[in-house]
From Swiss-Prot:
The UniProt record lists the keyword GTP-binding: no
Function according to Swiss-Prot or TrEMBL: May act as an antimicrobial peptide.
GO cellular component: extracellular region
Protein's name in the database: Septenin 2c
Organism whose genome encodes this protein: Osteopilus septentrionalis
Length: 23
């Protein structure tokens, strides 16, 4: 999920999920 933060730039939804993963 943390990796989704970087890939989240492509998908807004994944970006939000990625940030939650970091937190």
């Amino acid at each position: 999920i943390i990796g989704d933060t970087i890939n989240g730039a492509i998908t807004t939804a994944d970006n939000i999920v990625g940030r939650i993963g970091i937190i």
